[in-house]
Amino acid sequence: MKFLDFFRMGLVNLSRRKARTILTALSMAIGVMCIVVLISVGLGYEAAYRENIEAMGSLTKIDVTPPSDSTGGRTALLNDKAVDAFKSLNGVEAVTPVVQATAWLQSGSYIGSAKLYGIDLSTAESFLIYPVEGEMPGAGTHLRPEIMFTDDMAASFADPDKDWEFALNADGTPKVDLLHSTIKLTFDYANLSGEYQEGADGRAVSAGNMYRLKISGLCSAQNYTYATSGFLDKTRLEEWISANSAFIPQRSLEDTGGQKTYDLVWVKAAEGDDVQAIAKVIRDAGFQTYSLNDMFESVK
């Protein structure tokens, strides 16, 4: 038999079993379409999940914290030596120690509170901390330091004389203009409430220091990751903490051999693919790590 005969025989057989042939072809088509749809849904879910995570911050940022306990031998210290070691790791773009404190702010009769982050400002843009209005802060002076607040800070001020009613206009805009108002900062609420203590000469003096701020700009709160926060030079915030030790909890040096250590260090990976490898090296050195990249990797 020739090829044409085989072809003709196939057509005859197909014509005798039209229903079965159509159903088979239709089933295969539906199966292929289902596979394509499932793959598309999976890719779409991954993309949507990634967008949601990225809205909370950078997928290439790693938070490094001290070991949870000191049992089982020598404890890794999160100090300047460790910071330098992190900087030398392959794939690392930027590293900064993070000093943290909480302070009270005053603008006229309005009061607010802010979480302060003292960082190496030269690394700020690597961690997506940059001004959306104004400019990056410098070191400023001891009595009038420069600071950059998040763009939700103004709306958080409230009036203590009106049962802490938020300082907002009728249209919902903040009454406090951070970039053009006089803003003062203190770590002692008594400074704001008018309470005083007796000085050495018997006169009434405020218990804590009051600083007049120079606000250089406003940055994004990154989907509430840094809600009502301020960023300033790390050294300047360390000076404040030292000068206001009565109102800010101090880290004990007994367990660190007298060395200055940090509660938090930020590490920025140059590429997303490097995050897990860098985090593993840091964990192997005895530290704890956390990254939004961990959440993303968990659904892959």
Regions picked out by a protein language model, each given a short descriptive name:
Residues 1-35:
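N-terminal Sec/SRP start-transfer signal
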Residues 63-260, 264, 273-277, 284:
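Short acidic/glycine-enriched loop/turn elements at secondary-structure junctions
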Residues 28, 100-101, 296-297:
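Conserved beta-strand edge residues that scaffold enzyme active sites
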Residues 33-61:
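Alpha-helical transmembrane segments
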